[in-house]
């Protein structure tokens, strides 16, 4: 009698070199632009699903994918190499974006409507470059009298992303981090409990925001650590969809939506057709789309594009951001990532675990 084959789990099904995560991240970056189009275009509140905007869903997906990939990176690499790669992935692209915004985009707007000055531009770049202090949103008065007076309201998530990187980096110093995967699952359960308490007590602010994003990040981490036990199949994906729909209906996406979102991102990455999986495999524009989307939308608003309606405004922004994202990848991000093996940290690796280049 034939014995049914066990369901395929995440570890054997997820191919680190042939998956659709980059394509999914690109879609998520575009969804952030679409979501922001309502507020930046002056059309009112952003569309929501339950208690989360479309942009919030996208950011949650980003953090879940990062949790999966970055945890794998930390398990493979010593601390120095891990920190160096994380630095290269975030800061070169960010710093050039800040410079382009402060010394190209803002002066262009300033030439037409005034309000730009060199001290303001230097303050904007210097304050935001470390991603440590509270962020400066304006450069003089160049984006005053617009619906959202900020040059880049998307950058706030990077501080939380970096904090997650630091936590994983520190956890990697413990031998139990490698030998005891339940610690990751326990961390996810604990932070979910914290989010529940914060929601019940109606607590608001930076702590709540970080707790929610950390829960998505740790959901991805937990799927990585238990990848040899968790099935990655259509029936389980269907269950995840049902659970996610339930969180939307009950307005608890930010409390209980992390795990289904993380699972669905991974499952979708494995079932995409071959051509779709290739999107972003060589040229990953997702980060550039994310960090340049907001300033591009501000330029479009100042040019009067919001008169075309929210969806057209969003579509124009998605197209207009592509040259910025392409230049960011080709001229900044990709050259920076080629430096990941330079220096004394290059070549030192631990046993391989699932994950794409991170």
For each feature predicted by the language model, list its residue ranges.
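Interfacial loop-to-helix transition and helix-capping segments at the boundaries
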Residues: 16-21, 47-59, 147-160, 199-216, ...
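Functionally critical transmembrane alpha-helices in membrane proteins and complexes, commonly lining
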Residues: 16-74, 91-93, 289-294
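Solvent-exposed interhelical
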Residues: 162-191, 224-234, 309
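Membrane-interface helix-loop-helix regions
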Residues: 91, 95-162, 166, 262, ...
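C-terminal "closing" transmembrane helix and its immediate cytosolic amphipathic cap
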Residues: 1-12, 75, 297-358
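Structural signal for the C-terminal ends of transmembrane alpha-helices
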Residues: 70-77, 103-109, 170-179, 196-200, ...
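Juxtamembrane transmembrane-helix termini
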Residues: 2-8, 58-89, 93-116, 296, ...
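Alpha-helical transmembrane segments of multi-pass integral membrane proteins
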Residues: 242-334
């Amino acid at each position: 009698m034939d014995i049914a084959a066990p369901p395929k789990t995440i570890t054997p099904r997820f191919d680190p070199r042939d998956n659709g995560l980059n394509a999914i991240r690109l879609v998520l970056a575009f969804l952030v632009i679409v979501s922001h189009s309502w507020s930046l275009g002056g059309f009112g509140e952003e569309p929501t699903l339950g208690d989360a905007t479309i942009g919030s869903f996208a950011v949650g997906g980003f953090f879940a994918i990062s949790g999966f990939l970055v945890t794998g990176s930390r398990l493979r690499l010593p601390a120095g190499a891990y920190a160096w790669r994380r630095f290269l992935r975030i800061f070169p692209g960010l710093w050039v974006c800040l410079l382009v915004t402060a010394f190209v985009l803002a002066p262009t707007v300033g030439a037409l409507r005034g309000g730009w000055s060199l001290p303001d531009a230097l303050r904007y770049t210097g304050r935001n470059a470390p991603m440590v202090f509270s962020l400066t949103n304006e450069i003089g008065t160049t984006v005053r009298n617009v619906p959202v007076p900020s040059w880049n309201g998307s950058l706030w998530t990077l501080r939380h992303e970096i904090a997650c990187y630091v936590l994983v980096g520190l956890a990697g110093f413990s031998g139990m981090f490698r030998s005891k995967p339940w610690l990751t699952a326990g961390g996810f359960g604990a932070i979910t409990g914290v989010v529940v308490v914060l929601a019940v007590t109606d607590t608001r602010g930076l702590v709540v925001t970080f707790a929610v994003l950390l829960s998505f990040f740790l959901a991805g981490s937990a799927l990585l650590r238990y990848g040899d036990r968790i099935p990655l199949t259509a029936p389980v994906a269907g269950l995840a969809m049902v659970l996610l729909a339930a969180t939307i209906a009950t307005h608890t996406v930010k409390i209980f939506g992390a795990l289904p979102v993380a699972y669905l991102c991974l499952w979708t990455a494995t079932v995409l057709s071959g051509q779709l999986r290739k999107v972003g495999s060589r040229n990953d524009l997702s980060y550039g789309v994310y960090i340049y989307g907001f300033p591009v939308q501000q330029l479009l608003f100042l040019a009067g594009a919001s008169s075309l309606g929210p969806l057209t405004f969003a579509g124009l922004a998605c197209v207009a951001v592509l040259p910025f994202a392409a230049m960011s990848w080709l001229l900044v991000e990709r050259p920076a990532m080629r430096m990941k093996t330079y220096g004394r940290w290059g070549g030192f690796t631990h046993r391989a675990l699932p994950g794409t280049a991170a």
